[in-house]
Amino acid sequence: MEGERRAYSKEVHQRINKQLEEIRRLEEVRGDLQVQISAAQNQVKRLRDSQRLENMDRLLKGRAQVQAEIEELQEQTRALDKQIQEWETRIFTHSKNVRSPGFILDQKVKIRRRIRILENQLDRVTCHFDNQLVRNAALREELDLLRIDRNRYLNVDRKLKKEIHHLHHLVSTLILSSTSAYAVREEAKAKMGLLRERAEKEEAQSEMEAQVLQRQILHLEQLHHFLKLKNNDRQPDPDVLEKREKQAGEVAEGVWKTSQERLVLCYEDALNKLSQLMGESDPDLLVQKYLEIEERNFAEFNFINEQNLELEHVQEEIKEMQEALVSARASKDDQHLLQEQQQKVLQQRMDKVHSEAERLEARFQDVRGQLEKLKADIQLLFTKAHCDSSMIDDLLGVKTSMGDRDMGLFLSLIEKRLVELLTVQAFLHAQSFTSLADAALLVLGQSLEDLPKKMAPLQPPDTLEDPPGFEASDDYPMSREELLSQVEKLVELQEQAEAQRQKDLAAAAAKLDGTLSVDLASTQRAGSSTVLVPTRHPHAIPGSILSHKTSRDRGSLGHVTFGGLSSSTGHLPSHITHGDPNTGHVTFGSTSASSGGHVTFRPVSASSYLGSTGYVGSSRGGENTEGGVESGGTASDSSGGLGSSRDHVSSTGPASSTGPGSSTSKDSRG
């Protein structure tokens, strides 16, 4: 029984341990899940996921529409192939029926006349193209000047920022000095107040001591005067004078007594007088009192002498104290004047510092106002131009205001948007049959007055048609090696197409009669129209511009693509669509600022010429990557024009497009 209980308890403990381990494992899993949930619930990632989902949904819809359009185009190509086969069978059957030599000669004459007409048209178009290349070179120089102006503006902006920083530092130092001067001034005021109170107390105390000393001096002077009066000789008594006269009369009469008698009588008279004065008849007591009085008078005399000495000493002390008081008052006045002077100097310095601080503050506020106005204008221009803010959102996050360091980024995006809008405006002017030169100059916002007076002569290209097998790509800006390989392929394909065209013309001259000359021209137009891909709904694909135009009298087809094909999900909220039933359909969608937008021009006649300029206004490196321009056209564009365009892709500086590699002579077309 005990063993079963132990086994059961052991089994229960094992189960509990397993459950605890499972609980810990589940807690770790729960922590990982919470971390993943918090990461998934992050605002930025949710926004990115939502934008990616929207972009994917939009791309899927565009893919379905493109597939439908591809199927329709394949059906159209099959129908056109059937028509071509029918026309070829009809031509072959008709050539079997008609073998007249006059018809063949007439057909040759008409073909030669048609060739001369086309050559004349080609010469005119090549002249326009050469003029456009010259204007493009001039515009590149102007663009370089504008870049230099932009660098100067950035230098001035940096200098102003340094000056503002210096002014901030100067204002802070002035504020510190003014606060320290104010503290020193307050401390000096407190010390002056204490010294003033102390001087007032000392003055009151000295006045009280002077009054006490004056009273003592007055008392001593009165006592001294009294003692002087007392010590003066007494005036003779009238009785004594009378007695002396009486004695003199007795002596003269002979009645004068002896000296003894006279002495006794004198003593008696003296005793009688003393007894009368003192009120004492006993001579012993009278003598004793007299001695006491004499001793007392002598003591008083000694005391008066001592008091006189003390009086002289006190007078000397009073004189010294008065001199010390006068010197103390003079030193106090000097110290007070010195403190007033120091206070005035400090006040002047404080006023000067305050005025300087106010001036610097006013200047700083002025500069700050100009800077805020400039930022507001840049923000307004950025909003009105509908610039792409995805790169700014990625870099700055959730900031809604423009900082001082963000002005260069906003200006670069505005410059990029301006180049795009000018290109779009030039394309619209070209589609509305404006002057070719004006439309070319509008690409960079220039006019005919800005052209140089001296232009170097250029060699015109031999043709403006697309070479067979040329395909425009709008995936990304191609590198130098890719452009070189593509140019080599285009040259080979063009040579093969030229040889095949000559063979076809020779065969057609031998077979065709005079009645099928018009059909031959229409057949050539139909054959050239199958090279490009028409688009029925270009607005369904965001970030691109597709144009398809077929003209019977000109036989031309233009294709223009602006696109921002990047992985960034930030797009402008709106797109612009311009169309014309006669000139083709154009759609301008939003572009992304985080990668190079792509622009492709595919002209085959004089009506579409903008893509053959070979201009690229941006470099591929860095954050400010702008849309590249890929030009595809004739053999001359493949051999020389694209070479110059390749140079533009590799560098932002202007490249010479007037060299011999940009076009070939008319004599080399045979």
Curated annotation (Swiss-Prot):
Changing A248T: In CILD20; expressed at very low levels in patients' nasal epithelial cells; the genetic variation producing this missense variant predominantly affects splicing. The keyword Coiled coil applies. GO terms for biological process: cilium movement; outer dynein arm assembly. Its main location: cytoplasm. It comes from the Eukaryota. InterPro entries: ODA-DC/CCD, ODAD1_CC. GO terms for cellular component: axoneme; cilium; outer dynein arm; outer dynein arm docking complex. Pfam families: ODAD1_CC. Keywords: Cell projection, Ciliopathy, Cilium, Coiled coil, Cytoplasm, Cytoskeleton, Disease variant, Kartagener syndrome, Phosphoprotein, Primary ciliary dyskinesia. Component of the outer dynein arm-docking complex along with ODAD2, ODAD3, ODAD4 and CLXN. Interacts with ODAD3. Interacts with ODAD4; this interaction may facilitate the recruitment and/or attachment of outer dynein arm docking complex proteins, including ODAD1, ODAD3, and ODAD4 to ciliary axonemes. Interacts with DNAH9. Interacts with MNS1. Interacts with PIERCE1 and PIERCE2; the interactions link the outer dynein arms docking complex (ODA-DC) to the internal microtubule inner proteins (MIP) in cilium axoneme. This is Outer dynein arm-docking complex subunit 1. It comes from Homo sapiens (Human). The gene is ODAD1.
